[in-house]
Regions:
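Active-site-proximal segment of zinc-dependent metalloprotease catalytic domains
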Residues: 1-174
């Protein structure tokens, strides 16, 4: 039997189902990696998407503020200390799925481009439960073209970055 994961929109989803992110990482690692995903939320952040996603010098303006707010909003619901596996004072990483479309698949210039980054690199300090959140990734909920859930592609891509994996395609624009 499959482990029950969550119920969304009246439909049950299973972590280990064929086509799941878990299955992708498990199969890609020949059974060496079996990730655990804890789903929390949804929460509503304080500003409109354009505050976080508007383009400034070809980059999103404030996605890190969205990530910090999301962490603060779920702080009472979860114990962030359990996500610091090496006890170095930092949450290993988090992944935020934001509502709506992403700029990478056709959303307008005020939406967020899915990415991975570090809060501290952006000058943002986020401490929850005595641990710092730094490394994160985020991606959109809906695909602009199909108007359906995005599936696992972008999630797996950005999640791979927080695991330390590089892009395997040209990233310099040449």
């Amino acid at each position: 039997t499959r482990d029950y994961s969550y119920n969304y929109g009246g439909r049950k989803y299973f972590v280990t189902s064929e086509g799941s992110a878990w299955k992708y990482f498990y199969d890609s690692s020949n059974g060496q990696y079996s990730p655990q995903f804890d789903v929390v939320g949804p929460v509503t952040v304080s500003r409109e998407m354009s505050y976080y996603g508007k383009n400034v010098n070809s980059f999103d303006a404030n996605p890190w503020i969205m990530v910090k707010e999301a962490c603060q909003l779920v702080d009472d619901s979860i114990d962030f200390t359990k996500y610091d596996n090496n006890n170095d004072g930092y949450v290993d990483f988090i992944y935020v799925i934001y509502a709506g479309y992403g700029e990478a698949d056709g959303g307008d210039k005020n939406t967020i481009w899915p990415h991975s980054y570090w809060l501290m690199e952006a000058g943002v300090n986020c401490e929850v439960d005595g641990k710092y959140v730094d490394l994160y990734a985020c991606g959109n909920e809906l695909d602009y073209h199909s108007k359906q859930h995005t599936g696992i592609g972008t999630f797996c891509h950005e999640f791979s970055h927080v695991l330390g994996l590089p892009d395997l395609y040209e990233t310099t624009g040449n």
